């Protein structure tokens, strides 16, 4: 009876929705500090809560490095409260009709569309990417929400009647319980939207930890989810760094962890979370190669290389950071440089900007050091963006488009993921040599080949050991009816993000063997031998 009453309350809550987010954000508050810098709240039990923490992290505008907010490192008590809220909400949410959960997401995707530009503005302010790119960030996440609305078919089980006389076998998918997500700074909307909508539509409750550098988009997305009718406690949000990550990895009530970020963090979370008996999926670093054949459409290929290498200032796990020029295609290098020179570097909210700043001064320093390593190890810098100055934003973390040629696979700038607006260029004589270079690299997130020859494209797609391959498509991120299938050192776990695999990750199978005898008779004696069923 209690479960029925709780489920009825959930359904009533789902029907009480508003159509617009409030104009004044409820997830920011007036600062408790002496300055006027706002502080970011936690989201626990359906309420935006001011943290009692004495540890705070500054949020900077990467274009100016001014402090625009502060985010708390949640206390142990606050993190425990968030988990307790998830745990309390789970039974009623799991018992809620899948159609009702679907209705929440149908309303949610509409509210995201209506507030897309507001979310994008927050992303540009905190992360630095251009407004157009920020809108793309939100839109690609929205596509996953839209796909999650297909849950009624995606969660279907399997049935086999009459496996033997009067006996049927069937299986269905059930939610795991409390799941958690740890998101990176580079996609403040898309990556969280890969996580909690898929988990929640399956009947799980969710604990989200956005990047402490870019919390604003996730907080607005939480408000929109609440306005869509999601019951209190089904989504909770904490903030923090190492202590919050360890808390998520160790807490016994968390059943699964989704992570996107660096290799160092991903390996750590995968090992620690797995050690504590959790499912873990971890998307990590990359070194994505674009192989250019001499028969490719030159103008189209050059534009695609430049856009995929330098868009978002190279801060994408699917950035095309390495070009492999095959045969006569090496003659295109001067034109490649000219195309890159035409890109406009500016603050993300400025009209006409093609790429914005890097996320922090430390990120800029690391990128510049990797460029330096190329010159020290014998590479040539054809285009150098290290000394770029953006008028009016002299304190920003800007690096302009940079192209390094004569790169060899043993060089540091090739071996490490740069995560900046830097394209390293290698040259080979044959396609087979290019394939060998790609396959010898430990990463397996994405790759692309540019050619007008179908046989060449097919050979490359079949022989290259990379999880996602583009043919004349520089950033082959699958649409959400498929799954994001990075591989090798770019991924840890056995089930990928979104698509069918996303549903599998957030659910568990239950199989029922049922017998109703036609004669409705009782056994005359106990059956003590192993049932063979098929005889």
From Swiss-Prot:
Q: Which GO terms describe its molecular function?
A: malonate-semialdehyde dehydrogenase (acetylating) activity; methylmalonate-semialdehyde dehydrogenase (acylating, NAD) activity; RNA binding
Q: Name one GO biological process term.
A: valine metabolic process
This protein is called: Methylmalonate-semialdehyde/malonate-semialdehyde dehydrogenase [acylating], mitochondrial
| Ligand binding (NAD(+)) | 183, 185, 209, 212-213, 262, 417
EC number(s) per entry: 1.2.1.27
Q: Transit peptide: which range?
A: 1-33
Q: Which PANTHER family match?
A: MALONATE-SEMIALDEHYDE DEHYDROGENASE, METHYLMALONATE-SEMIALDEHYDE DEHYDROGENASE [ACYLATING], MITOCHONDRIAL
Catalysed transformations (reactions): 3-oxopropanoate + NAD(+) + CoA + H2O = hydrogencarbonate + acetyl-CoA + NADH + H(+); 2-methyl-3-oxopropanoate + NAD(+) + CoA + H2O = propanoyl-CoA + hydrogencarbonate + NADH + H(+); (R)-2-methyl-3-oxopropanoate + NAD(+) + CoA + H2O = propanoyl-CoA + hydrogencarbonate + NADH + H(+); (S)-2-methyl-3-oxopropanoate + NAD(+) + CoA + H2O = propanoyl-CoA + hydrogencarbonate + NADH + H(+)
Gene behind this protein: ALDH6A1
């Amino acid at each position: 009876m209690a479960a029925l009453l709780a489920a009825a309350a959930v359904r009533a809550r789902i029907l009480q929705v508003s159509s617009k987010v409030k104009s004044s954000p409820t997830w920011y508050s007036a600062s408790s500090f002496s300055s006027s810098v706002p502080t970011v709240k936690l989201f626990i039990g359906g309420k935006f809560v001011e943290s009692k923490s004495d540890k705070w992290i500054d949020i900077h505008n990467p274009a100016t490095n001014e402090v625009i907010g502060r985010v708390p490192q949640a206390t142990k008590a606050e993190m425990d409260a968030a988990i307790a809220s998830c745990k309390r909400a789970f039974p009623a949410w799991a018992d809620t009709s899948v159609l009702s959960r679907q209705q929440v997401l149908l309303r949610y995707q509409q509210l995201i569309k209506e507030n897309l530009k507001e979310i994008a503005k927050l992303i540009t302010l905190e992360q630095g990417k251009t407004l157009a790119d920020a809108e793309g960030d939100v839109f690609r996440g929205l596509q996953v929400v839209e796909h999650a609305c297909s849950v009624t078919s995606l969660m279907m089980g399997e049935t086999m009647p009459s496996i033997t006389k009067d006996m049927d076998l069937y299986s269905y998918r059930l939610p795991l319980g409390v799941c958690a997500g740890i998101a990176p700074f580079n996609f403040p909307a898309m990556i969280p939207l890969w996580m909690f909508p898929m988990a929640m539509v399956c009947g799980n409750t969710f604990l989200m930890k956005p990047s402490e550098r870019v919390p604003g988009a996730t907080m607005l997305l939480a408000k929109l989810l609440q306005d869509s009718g999601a019951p209190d406690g089904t989504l909770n949000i904490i903030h923090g760094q190492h202590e919050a990550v360890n808390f998520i990895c160790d807490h016994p009530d968390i059943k699964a962890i989704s992570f996107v970020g660096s290799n160092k963090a991903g390996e750590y979370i995968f090992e620690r979370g797995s050690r504590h008996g959790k499912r873990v999926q971890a998307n990590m670093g990359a070194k994505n190669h674009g192989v250019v054949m001499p028969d490719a459409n030159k103008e189209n290929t050059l534009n695609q290389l430049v856009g995929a290498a330098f868009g978002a200032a190279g801060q994408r796990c699917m950035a095309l950071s390495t070009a492999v020029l095959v045969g006569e295609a090496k003659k295109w290098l001067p034109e490649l440089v000219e195309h890159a020179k035409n890109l406009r570097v500016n603050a993300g909210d400025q009209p006409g900007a093609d790429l914005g700043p890097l996320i922090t001064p430390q990120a800029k320093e690391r990128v510049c050091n990797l460029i330096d390593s190329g010159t020290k190890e014998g590479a040539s810098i054809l285009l150098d963006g290290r000394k770029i100055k953006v008028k009016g934003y002299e304190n920003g973390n800007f690096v302009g488009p940079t192209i390094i040629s004569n790169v060899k696979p043993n060089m540091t700038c090739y071996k490490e993921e740069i995560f900046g607006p830097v394209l390293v260029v290698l040259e080979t004589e044959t396609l087979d040599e290019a394939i060998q270079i790609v396959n010898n690299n430990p990463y397996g997130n994405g790759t692309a080949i540019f050619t007008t020859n179908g046989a060449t494209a097919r050979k490359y797609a079949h022989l290259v050991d990379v999880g996602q391959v583009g043919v004349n498509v520089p950033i082959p991120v699958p649409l959400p009816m498929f799954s994001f299938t990075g591989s090798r050192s770019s991924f840890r776990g056995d089930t990928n993000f979104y698509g069918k695999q996303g549903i599998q990750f957030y659910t568990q199978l239950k199989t029922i063997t049922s017998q109703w005898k036609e004669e409705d008779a009782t056994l005359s004696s106990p059956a003590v031998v192993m049932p063979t069923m098929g005889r």
